[in-house]
From Swiss-Prot:
Protein name from the UniProt record: Ras-related protein rac-2
Propeptide: 193-195
Mutant phenotype after disruption: RNAi-mediated knockdown causes distal tip cells (DTC) to make extra turns in approximately 20 percent of animals during the last phase of gonad morphogenesis.
PANTHER family: RHO FAMILY GTPASE (PTHR24072)
């Protein structure tokens, strides 16, 4: 059975732990769970192949910045998460999470994940954001950010409703099974010959 290591990063309270628990247990936790560091493991079938998926949940709080990278070695794929109802967490993808991941693991693929998709159309959420002259992050904004940070995919999901949840992890596995393209491997595979 092939093993894939997937590390999940993003601001505190964007739903990283709920994402992992909902996926691995099919149950949504009812209360906020502060994470320092945790791992989950599950055996799944993707495209007819048995996979042992090791999921590494990291703390998003600044207090843990100096330790978080210790979970990065041998990572096959990163899920960089932000909450669709939290524009500040979206901006931190550019300001904090992409720089941190690309500094420590420049050749490891990234999937950008917008969490809490169920709240994008929620009236209370929209009103709370409107009071602060904000709005939920749009799909287009997420897609543009994914291109900017060179993510291999942009996906949205809800841990509460599980909409898009399986797709996030199926894509993480598919991405982890594909060796990263470094400039050297791209050059070797190039069909271009200069004479």
């Amino acid at each position: 059975m092939q093993a894939i290591k997937c590390v999940v990063v993003g601001d505190g309270a964007v739903g990283k732990t709920c994402l992992l628990l909902s996926y691995t247990t099919n149950a949504f936790p009812g209360e906020y769970i502060l994470t320092v560091f945790d791992t989950y493991s599950t055996n799944v079938m993707v495209d007819g192949r048995p996979i042992n998926l090791s999921l590494w949940d990291t703390a998003g709080q600044d207090d843990y910045d100096q330790f978080r990278h210790l979970s990065f070695p041998q990572t096959d794929v990163f899920l960089v998460c932000f909450a669709l109802n939290n524009p500040a967490s979206f901006e931190n993808v550019r300001a904090k999470w992409y720089p941190e991941v690309s500094h420590h693991c420049p050749n490891t693929p990234i999937i950008l994940v917008g969490t809490k998709a169920d709240l994008r159309e929620d009236r209370d959420t929209i009103e709370r954001l409107r009071e602060r002259r904000l709005q939920p992050v749009s799909h287009t904004q997420g897609y543009v950010m994914a291109k900017e940070i060179k993510a291999v995919k942009y996906l949205e999901c809800s841990a509460l409703t599980q909409i898009g949840l399986k797709q996030v992890f199926d894509e993480a596995i598919r991405t982890g099974l594909t060796p990263p393209q470094t400039p050297q491997t791209r050059a070797k595979k190039s069909n271009c010959t200069v004479l």
